[in-house]
Amino acid sequence: FGEVYGEARVGLVVPQYVTIHSINELEANKDRFSSEIVGIDAGAGIMKTTDKAIAAYGLDGYTLMTSSSSTMLASLKKAMDKGEWIVITGWTPHWMFDQFDLKFLDDPKKVYGDLEEIHAIAWKGFSEKDPFAAEFFGNIKLTTEELSSFMTAMKDARMDEEEIARKWRDEHRQLVD
């Protein structure tokens, strides 16, 4: 069917109020960040890439902290509540971008690569079996904000997935009609 989302990205993420804009600036500001990059599970691909970024950008004074996603996000919330500087491993799409005012640090050495895409695909004959769904998936294009808001709804939901999807669809009619 084609691209549904064209802003998929991984990298290092900071709150918007942090005044640096590039991974190049981390070393000079390591005291502000307590010399830590807060990450997720040790075996995750983003953690391996962050180890490469630490080497590529000469961030020898930094420690990459392993934790769970939920612990990383709790650390982010705690730091942001206090207005402290924090750098985490991050990716889009993710609901954290709907909940927190965040930005990716520029990666001039492209250690984390370029933007990626999410595509809708289906089995042969799907379009004939469900032409409405095929048209929907062929036409829908989501932004980070739209996809993050849907992911937040799924995370926070106290209802089943179908109800969440219907509610989100009704609130985003311009995307699905």
Predicted regions and their residues:
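Ligand-binding pocket segment of bilobal, Venus flytrap-like solute-binding proteins
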Residues: 46-108
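Solvent-exposed loop/turn segments at secondary-structure junctions
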Residues: 17-20, 42-46, 92-96, 126-127
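Periplasmic-binding protein-like
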Residues: 4-11, 70, 93-144
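A conserved helix-loop-strand patch within extracytoplasmic ligand-binding domains
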Residues: 1-43
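Second-shell loop/turn segments in exported
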Residues: 11-13, 35-42, 60-63, 122-124, ...
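Ligand-binding cleft/hinge of the Venus flytrap
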Residues: 28-64, 167-170
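C-terminal functional modules
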Residues: 140, 144-177
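Extracytoplasmic/secreted proteins, especially bacterial periplasmic and envelope-associated proteins
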Residues: 21, 25, 45-52, 71, ...
